[in-house]
């Protein structure tokens, strides 16, 4: 965050949700963490920003004072995206950003990722969902045994090609 990098961790229930905190507190957790580097914002300003992100991300919540656990998984994920968008980071690391959420929420997150990329943000996505990669990626780095084996351009990304490189089948064929 300090160096303009933000990360949306996978498994939101273990890595992001603070169940005893409300939506607003969960959304601004990073803001309070950053207060050592910059002045904290007022509750009024937090609520204004909450309303902005609620509309922008289509977060379905009755009140910002409701517990985060009252939201669906997709809406929780949007709150955590707002948490990091609020930092205005230049680089976003998204680890399985649509894992365990409904199709509608996935589409909204894809739209947001594309919009952020248009704004010049660098977005690195870790996912096993190849259709997700096809929708939002300019490039796809395929790993095998912890090393990048191949970098595919957007038009090269398809399930067969990604699977071939990720299982090292392409290198086995080239070695024959």
What name fits each language-model region?
Residues 1-176:
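Glycine-rich phosphate-binding loops of nucleotide-dependent enzymes
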């Amino acid at each position: 965050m300090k160096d303009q990098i933000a990360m949306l961790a996978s498994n939101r229930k273990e890595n992001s949700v603070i169940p005893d905190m409300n939506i607003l507190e969960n959304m601004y957790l990073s803001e309070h963490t950053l207060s050592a580097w910059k002045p904290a914002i007022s509750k009024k300003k937090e609520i204004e920003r909450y309303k902005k992100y609620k509309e922008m991300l289509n977060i379905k919540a009755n009140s910002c004072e409701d517990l985060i656990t009252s939201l669906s998984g997709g809406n929780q994920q949007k709150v955590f995206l707002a948490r990091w968008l609020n930092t205005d980071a230049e680089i976003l690391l998204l680890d399985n950003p649509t894992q365990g959420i409904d199709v509608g929420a996935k589409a909204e997150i894809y739209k947001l990722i594309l919009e952020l990329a248009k704004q010049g943000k660098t977005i690195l996505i870790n996912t096993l969902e190849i259709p997700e990669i096809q929708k939002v990626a300019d490039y796809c780095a395929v790993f095998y045994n912890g090393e990048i084996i191949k970098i595919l351009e957007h038009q090269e990304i398809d399930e067969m090609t990604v699977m071939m490189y990720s299982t090292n089948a392409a290198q086995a064929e080239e070695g024959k």
